[in-house]
Amino acid sequence: MSQVILDLQLACEDNSGLPEESQFQTWLNAVIPQFQEESEVTIRVVDTAESHSLNLTYRGKDKPTNVLSFPFEVPPGMEMSLLGDLVICRQVVEKEAQEQGKPLEAHWAHMVVHGSLHLLGYDHIEDDEAEEMEALETKIMLALGYEDPYIAEKE
């Protein structure tokens, strides 16, 4: 049986109203076991200052972002189940959900699904990559009981 080990780090000034650890686990389990047997993922929920700093340092973008993915690169010859880290900014996720008229829980789920696919090597830089990744995200979100996260863009 495939298993995802979750290391959840809540690094917000106010952690109230965040999804439960069991929800994060459910969202990870909907994605990762399809691709690899055992995995360990860290999800760190942060405020805008930390997201902004990481986004500037690692992507050269001078603003906070919804989710950053940091895949772990296993040295040659070693076998490790550590997949990587997701850093999710609480305030950006909450703002986007409100602006896009999406249920907050669904947007949290989407950020975990989206970030997990990045950890697994998916990307959306080129149009064909974006189509493949978005199709996978939609399939997983529907399987979790949420709407297509890209429905507004398709209308």
Swiss-Prot record:
Annotated binding of Zn(2+), by residue: 114, 118, 124
A Gene Ontology term for the protein's cellular component: cytoplasm
Superkingdom assignment: Bacteria
Major location category of this protein: cytoplasm
Molecular functions per Gene Ontology: metalloendopeptidase activity; RNA endonuclease activity; zinc ion binding
Annotated keywords: Cytoplasm, Endonuclease, Hydrolase, Metal-binding, Nuclease, Ribosome biogenesis, rRNA processing, Zinc
Cofactors demanded by this protein: Zn(2+)
Biological processes annotated in GO: rRNA processing
Cofactor note (record): Binds 1 zinc ion.
Enzyme Commission number: 3.1.-.-
Localisation: Cytoplasm
Assigned protein family: Belongs to the endoribonuclease YbeY family.
NCBIfam families hit by this protein: rRNA maturation RNase YbeY
PANTHER family: ENDORIBONUCLEASE YBEY, CHLOROPLASTIC
Role this protein plays: Single strand-specific metallo-endoribonuclease involved in late-stage 70S ribosome quality control and in maturation of the 3' terminus of the 16S rRNA.
Name assigned to this protein: Endoribonuclease YbeY
Organism: Shigella boydii serotype 18 (strain CDC 3083-94 / BS512)
